[in-house]
Swiss-Prot record:
The protein's name: Eukaryotic translation initiation factor 3 subunit K
HAMAP family, sorted: eIF3k (MF_03010)
SUPFAM superfamilies linked: ARM repeat (SSF48371), Winged helix' DNA-binding domain (SSF46785)
Entry's family note: Belongs to the eIF-3 subunit K family.
Organism encoding this protein: Anopheles gambiae
Amino acid sequence: MVHYVKMEDGKVMPIQEMLKSIERYNPEHLKVIEAYVEEQARENQYDLEANLACLKLYQFNPHLLNLDITYIILLKALTNFPHTDFVLCKCLLLPAQMNDETVKEIIYLADILEKCDFSLFWSRLAKHPENYQKISGFHDSIRKFVCHVVGITFQTIERGYLMQLLGNVEEKVLLSWLKRYGWKEEGGLVTIATQEDNIKTKHITEKIEFDNLAPLMANCL
């Protein structure tokens, strides 16, 4: 669904177009942007530019700060690991946001994810389920990051360990992820893509002009 904002002259502009203009700093558009953030959570969508614009408006207008929207923005940034979206969002936080207990918890979760301590991440998440319930597709987005890390780290991995890294998932959930990434299971081991699949030979050709060689040849005489 496309969100629109109404300009002072009465014209209507799509929110993506508004975000590319100076109007992104107009606090009158904040409610529309916040509604767009909530839609991202419901519909499993993601728009980093809109979320950063929202945090920037909070910076310029601290009296308009909405902590619930802040939580959604930070949690959505978590779902886009290993990209640096979370760092960008964190840099725009006000002291009032940084001192909030839920924000502190989300930042802690980000630190755990960055260290790839997935077992700790899932156990910590289970203690505060209310923090992410509004984020559609949250678990699967994190599992996608887990599979990314597994794919660049392992050639084979124990089946039970992989299930643990994915959040102690059930059999059918594991099988769906194996199918998604084309991983094969045999004898309790899951085979990830071989090194030959991951490493591609690169042929590098460098063109050297004679004029560039002339000084070097002169020095050799």
